[in-house]
Amino acid sequence: IYVGMEHSIGDTSFPLRLIRAQFPKLAVPPIGQPCYDSENRLVGIVLGVSRKGTCHLLPARAISFLATHPEAKRVRLGCLLDINSSTPVIEGLINGGPLARGGIQTGDILININDTPIRNYGDMLDATYYLTGDKPLSIEVIRGTQVVTSKGILPTQDPR
């Protein structure tokens, strides 16, 4: 049974939102097991299981992305967002980092990455997870009462 999406558990943050599913204790799938919906579509693969029957799944979209982009690097923007905030306000920037070089400022509200709407921290995680890192980014923020767009930002790349 689908419960929700989570970007962290306790002090552990994930590189993207994982699907949280609850199963009856006797029907908990093992780690590595694919899970399907009622229409037999892949939902994800089980990454972890708790004693209470809660599972975390790697979403099918992530599996597909990694299969089609095996060389993709992990993209980093060089910014800090409050993981618990309902608004994606840029709390800090790494000096000389991608967003700082693109003119983004502390206090800006992140609203789009390459035309993907950003409403919260989880949206930002997912948007950056599915980037390949080989193309410049377009970032849109709200600064005061203005919408500001910065194009041509080259992200930092790390191995996945």
Show which residues each predicted segment covers.
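Active-site region of chymotrypsin-like
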Residues: I1-V49, V75, I83, T87-G92
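A generic structural motif
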Residues: V49, T116, M124, L154-P155
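A structural signal for beta-strand boundary/capping segments at domain termini and interdomain linkers
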Residues: V147-T149
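Terminal peptide-recognition signature
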Residues: Y2, A21, C35, N40, ...
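PDZ domains, with a preference for the canonical peptide-binding region formed by the helix
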Residues: N112-E140
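Conserved PDZ fold ligand-binding element
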Residues: C35-G44, L99-G122
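C-terminal cap/linker of serine protease catalytic domains
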Residues: S38-S86, D126, G144, D158-R160
